[in-house]
Regions:
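Residue-level preference for the first positions of well-ordered beta-strands
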Residues: 127-131, 158, 189, 221
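Walker A/P-loop nucleotide-binding motif
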Residues: 124-144
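Walker B catalytic acidic pair
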Residues: 194-195
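Short glycine-rich substrate-engagement loop in P-loop NTPases that contacts/grips substrate
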Residues: 108-117, 148-189, 199-206
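A short, basic N-terminal segment
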Residues: 1-104, 267-280
């Protein structure tokens, strides 16, 4: 044991010189590259404890190398964290590509989505969500995905899913409905995509209400995308829909999406490219 302790002390107090290093006028070892000391003297009381008068010190070269290693390790940990958040947060791998960097810049609501991310802490504190509504293919889901990706890059957990998947998960869940819904509500931001497209059975509507109501009571923001119109939401067909829409509208700011159908444009471009390849 004594030998092991001595070995540790030796390692702590001994500097291994490089070929270009040299001894300065003060008797300390200096780096041959940056000309800064690689050693420093102990205070007299510490020297008596360690049985030697000096200990290793960082020269500029060593400090730079250490900072670069630490920065690389920090980047690696960040990338690992973001990867895990996206693995858990997205239900479709293509959602990873829905980013502001990949945006074509034509959607007039892109600025609003960016500001939501920039002011996330305020949105979170004040429990401000969004209801993206409008026609098919107008970019609602894409911009919701942009918000999700941007927040995950900041290491903020987000879950983006839809009620078709939620209902399937609830039907197959072994952990119980309450625990599943509680897990959804633990995310700082929950995004429900394509709201209103799920089957309108009594069971389905009850589960939709349970999720919306639980999120409502959690005090955490919710973003919803839907093809329903604002008129549909303000004039529900029955009580079951009314209590769902009421909670949505009380927590989510309606944002209208208009303009061209981007999916149709993409399909048209692909068709034209295919025709060109075939006819050439």
């Amino acid at each position: 044991m004594k030998n092991e302790i001595n070995a540790v002390l030796e390692n702590m107090t001994t500097t291994i010189p490089e070929p270009e290093d040299y001894t300065g006028e003060d008797g300390l070892l200096y780096c041959g590259k940056c000309r800064k000391p690689k050693e420093a003297y102990f205070a007299p009381d510490k020297a008596a404890i360690f049985g030697r008068d000096r200990h290793p010190a960082e020269c500029d070269c060593q400090r730079t190398a250490r900072e670069e290693r630490e920065a690389a390790e920090k980047r690696r940990r960040h990338l690992d964290t973001v990867e895990e958040l996206k693995r858990r947060g997205f239900t479709d791998p293509t959602m990873r590509d829905w980013t502001f960097e990949n945006d074509n810049g034509r959607n007039p609501q892109t600025g609003l989505a960016r500001r939501y991310v920039e002011h996330w802490e305020d949105m979170r504190t004040d429990n401000i969500g969004c209801l993206f509504w409008g026609g098919v293919g107008t970019g609602k889901s894409y911009l919701a995905g942009c918000i999700a990706n941007a927040l995950m890059e900041k290491e903020i957990p987000v879950r983006m899913t839809n009620f078709a998947l939620i209902l399937n998960d609830l039907a197959a869940s072994f952990e119980g409905r309450n625990e599943y819904i509680s897990r959804l509500c633990r995310y700082p931001l929950l995004i429900l995509d394509d709201f209103g497209m799920e089957r309108g059975t009594e069971y389905g509507l009850e589960q939709v209400f349970n999720v919306i109501d639980s999120r409502y009571r959690s005090g955490k923001p919710l973003i919803v995308t839907t093809n329903l119109t604002l008129d549909d939401l303000h004039n529900p067909e029955d009580t079951a829909h009314s209590r769902i829409y009421d909670r949505l509208l009380s927590r989510c700011v309606p944002v209208r999406f208009t303009g061209d159908n981007f999916r149709q444009e993409t399909a048209k471009r692909k068709m034209e490219s295919m025709k060109k390849l075939i006819t050439d």
